[in-house]
Amino acid sequence: MNILELSQKRFSVRKYSDTPVSEEDLQYILEVTRMAPSAVNKQPWKFVVVKSEAARKQLQECYDRDWFKSAPLYIICMREVDSNWIRKEDNKQHGDIDVAIATEHLCLAATERGLGSCWVCNFNVAKLKETFPYTGFEPVAIISIGHIADDCPTNEKKRKTLEEITDII
């Protein structure tokens, strides 16, 4: 599958089967994530793999949705607070951007392996920080990963046209 096909195939999965994610698939996904670019090669990230039953239950308390509980695996995507490249002109920090780039690499790698994923950003930040304390890091997103359930709801992918989002000058 090429990158366009992966992008077209990937969607936000909100129902997973009971089949666990293989260690081989997980390691592949993590390696693709590791290879993502970042501003000035700072790599200001940490990816916390949540797969034990106890840790999964704790994480589910940080985002209490029924569909979320069906995922066999989660990855908490974190930004290193003091290791962001900062643009001098306007002091814009690029850490969240860098983590987002790596996280989308993660999601596309999961798709390539026949797995589904879903970005979650509307979690209880304070509870997550308390439950999974990583000094010097802050959570940016949680990605649920797993095999897509046969009865997983899907929506038609709606995207703006190229004309709406681009200018060629």
Where are the predicted features?
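Short secondary-structure junction motifs
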Residues: 42-45, 112-115, 140
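Acidic, glycine-rich active-site loops and adjacent beta-strand->loop/helix elements
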Residues: 81-82, 123-126, 149
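Short proline/glycine-enriched turn/loop segments at secondary-structure junctions
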Residues: 129-135, 153-156
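Short coil/turn connectors at secondary-structure junctions
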Residues: 69-73, 115, 136-140
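Glycine/small-residue-rich phosphate/adenosyl-binding loop
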Residues: 25, 30-31, 35-102
